[in-house]
UniProtKB/Swiss-Prot annotation:
Belongs to the intron maturase 2 family. MatK subfamily. The keyword Transmembrane helix does not apply. One of its GO terms (molecular function) is RNA binding. GO terms for cellular component: chloroplast. Its main location: plastid. It comes from Portulacaria afra (Elephant's food). One of its GO terms (biological process) is tRNA processing. Usually encoded in the trnK tRNA gene intron. Probably assists in splicing its own and other chloroplast group II introns. It is found in: Plastid, Chloroplast. HAMAP family: MatK. Keywords: Chloroplast, mRNA processing, Plastid, RNA-binding, tRNA processing. The keyword RNA-binding applies. It comes from the Eukaryota. The lineage of its organism: Eukaryota, Viridiplantae, Streptophyta, Embryophyta, Tracheophyta. This is Maturase K.
Length: 505
């Protein structure tokens, strides 16, 4: 925190979220550059200047000139900035990254200040940062629930909606106007441009705007859930200090969009067992209620997005499923509630009884077809799952080739270790091992059989995870305890993102 404040003075203007002066500070773009390389906001050396501040000022000045706006809107190839189209795109990207750094600052400071003096709570909630922590929650809660809503959160049809959401937090009109100018100059806020184009070219800024937009929606949604439930949910980092949220809440009550009495809305959705989980653009709303209650939630969410956030969502983007009959497609797994029957023989004196027990079990299965498709797209196998050589890596050193394949295999094994059925995971390992062997054999102009015979067991050890190596040293592979550990689901509390090959959404 002190290191961060060394670069940014928190004076009175900053306390009111005035960002415009920061746009002309060169170290802001150094932060953005360093974050792109090292995934770190702060620079080790603040004097290492990555960009030219003069070029940034020139570009911002031209953005305010009407002639330049006309040229940008018409997609003209003449009179490109600095005479080179790729340089213009470079500095547009540079300003985009700078904007993202600037707007992230107040929310980072807000989160840090709100957690000061709460070290014990931070330690307790540290493991919740892992996306794997969602699945133990499913195992604990979903066994007692009946229905689930699988929700695809709609994207805004216009980037202006994302910018307007910032007005509740950012009071600097100049910064907001400049952000709009930037989007117009880059031909992003136009009917002919898709929002997906912006998200690919300006990932960091788009992700911030979109996540902030979803945070605003979830703030009101969590409030409604709290009012309709006997149990109060716990607020975490993205729901802290909702000063402006309560202002919007008053507006929501005054409008009375769906009924004359706000309490009637809450009575319609009275449910003491309601659970909500979201990852990226997909969320799950699970309940112990009836099918009628879930249909009410479905159409309420559709009208809620449309009336208060200008988001058009079609009913088919929200699926209502019964947990006992359908599987959840979430975060690379098919999750379902399975019934396990067991017969127990009980002997009492001269009488014997057969007791049939049915136990619910939360089951997780790897989505093997999309994962094999991702491996085929990355040229590790064909569309049928048959391993092939990675020709683009054939010029690397042998150690680098083995290290790359081994790292991918370990990462996927680490993430999919929670699967209840390991057969699909073994298939993925087989594809990567044989693809690695064929790549090395192609490099040395040899056969796979001869190459594997030369390397022996040392080659296979590169594809083992650290946990598998430790277990193999402590327990024999054929022991009952070892088989139980290898076959059972294992959830890790240090996974903060999904591997690119596993993320096929």
């Amino acid at each position: 925190m002190e290191f961060f404040q060394r670069y940014i003075e928190l004076d009175r203007s900053w306390q009111h979220n005035f960002f415009y002066p920061l746009i002309f500070q060169e170290y802001i773009y150094g932060f953005a550059y360093d974050h792109g390389l090292n995934k770190s906001i702060l620079l080790e050396n603040a004097d290492d200047k990555k960009y030219s501040l003069l070029i940034v000022k020139r570009l911002i000045t031209r953005m305010y000139q009407q002639n330049h706006l006309i040229l940008a809107a018409n997609n003209s190839n003449q009179n490109d900035f600095l005479g080179h189209k790729h340089k213009k795109n470079l500095y547009y990207q540079m300003i985009s990254e700078g904007f993202a750094v600037i707007v992230e600052i107040p929310f980072s400071l807000l989160l840090i200040s709100s957690l000061e003096g709460k070290e014990k709570k931070i330690v307790k909630s540290h493991n919740l940062r892992s996306i794997h922590s969602v699945f133990p929650f499913f195992e604990d809660k979903f066994l007692h629930l009946n229905y689930v809503l699988e929700i695809l959160i709609p994207y805004p049809i216009h980037l202006e909606i994302l910018v307007q959401t910032l007005r509740y937090w950012v009071k600097d009109a100049s910064a907001l106007h400049l952000l709009r100018f930037f989007l117009y100059c880059n031909s992003l806020i136009t009917p002919s441009k898709s929002i997906s184009i912006f998200s690919k070219r300006n990932q960091r800024l788009f992700l911030f705007l979109y996540n902030f937009h979803v945070c605003e929606y979830e703030s009101i949604f969590v409030f409604l859930c709290n009012q309709s439930s006997h149990l109060r949910s716990t607020s975490f980092g993205d729901l802290l200090q909702r000063i402006y949220f309560y202002g919007k809440l008053e507006y929501l009550v005054k409008v009375k969009t769906f009924t004359k009495d706000f309490r009637i809305i809450l009575w319609l959705f009275k449910d003491p067992f309601l659970h909500y989980v979201r990852y990226r653009g997909k969320s799950i709303l699970a309940s112990k209620g009836t099918s009628l209650l879930m249909h009410k939630w479905k159409y309420y969410l559709i009208h809620f997005w449309q009336c208060h956030f200008s988001l058009w969502s079609q009913p088919r983007r929200i699926y209502i499923n019964r947990l006992s009959k359908h599987s959840l497609d979430f975060m690379g797994f098919f999750s379902s509630v399975r019934l396990n029957s067991s017969v127990v023989r009980s002997q009492m004196v001269e009488n014997a009884f057969l007791i049939d027990n049915t136990i619910k079990k939360f089951d997780t299965i790897i989505r093997i077809i999309p994962l094999v498709g991702s491996l085929a797209k990355a040229k590790f196998c064909n569309v049928l799952g048959h391993p092939i050589s990675k020709s683009v890596w054939a010029d690397l050193l042998d150690s680098d080739i083995i290290d790359r394949f081994g790292r991918i295999c370990r990462n996927l094994s680490h993430y999919y270790s929670g699967s209840s059925r390991k057969k699909s995971l073994y298939r993925i390992k087989y594809i990567l091992r044989l693809s690695c062997a064929r790549t090395l054999a192609r490099k040395h102009k040899s056969t796979v059989r001869a190459f594997l015979k030369t390397l022996g067991s040392e080659f296979l050890e590169e594809f083992f995870t650290e946990e598998e190596k430790v277990l193999s040293l402590i327990l024999p592979r054929d022991s009952s305890i070892s088989r139980g550990l290898y076959r059972g689901p294992i959830w890790y509390l240090d996974i903060i993102c999904i591997h690119d090959l596993a993320n096929d959404d």
